[in-house]
């Protein structure tokens, strides 16, 4: 597909993504990054707002699947609590995990999106296979390297600033 560091849509949190907005964008399957998108790196416990959003989304017509580069057990335990499908060791920005998810659901790439907090993994990976990319603000910039990476992403965020959804 295309090599692009620019997200299709920018939001502050996945909790801003409603079934109505996703349907407007033509999205039937929302893939979610795990760490710093749904929960911080330091815990598997979502905020009350995130838990409420997950339950609302699970009762909608939008399919959800966690696609994470994280270790299997940590993600599977979380997803099991909410009845979420998950794909671990996704190797984003490479296409392995995203293509596995597309194959599992049988939904065309143009009707799918990947929401995540990293341009160099989530956005690039999604764009590379023709899936819409949704950049979310990281839940927690808890260390120097995450902060540095987010600073390096600022030029791309600036270029895509008109794609922000309030």
Q: Where do the language-model regions lie?
A:
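Asp-based, Mg2+/Mn2+-dependent phosphohydrolase catalytic module
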Residues: 2-32, 39, 43-44, 48-114, ...
């Amino acid at each position: 597909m295309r090599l692009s560091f620019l997200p299709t849509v920018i939001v502050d949190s996945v909790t801003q993504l409603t079934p109505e907005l996703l349907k407007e964008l033509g999205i039937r399957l929302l893939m979610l990054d795990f760490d710093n998108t749904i929960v911080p790196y330091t815990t598997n416990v979502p905020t009350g707002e995130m838990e409420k959003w997950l339950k609302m989304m699970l009762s909608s017509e939008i399919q959800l699947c966690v696609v994470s580069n994280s270790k299997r057990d940590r993600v599977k335990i979380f997803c099991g609590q909410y009845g979420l499908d998950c794909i671990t060791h996704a190797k984003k920005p490479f296409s392995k995990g995203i293509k596995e998810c597309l194959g599992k659901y049988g939904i065309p790439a143009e009707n799918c999106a990947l929401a995540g907090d990293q341009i160099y993994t989530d956005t690039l990976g999604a764009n590379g296979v023709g899936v819409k990319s949704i950049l979310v603000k990281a839940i927690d910039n808890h260390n120097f390297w995450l902060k540095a990476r987010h600073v390096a992403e600022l030029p791309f965020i600036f270029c895509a600033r008109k794609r922000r959804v309030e």
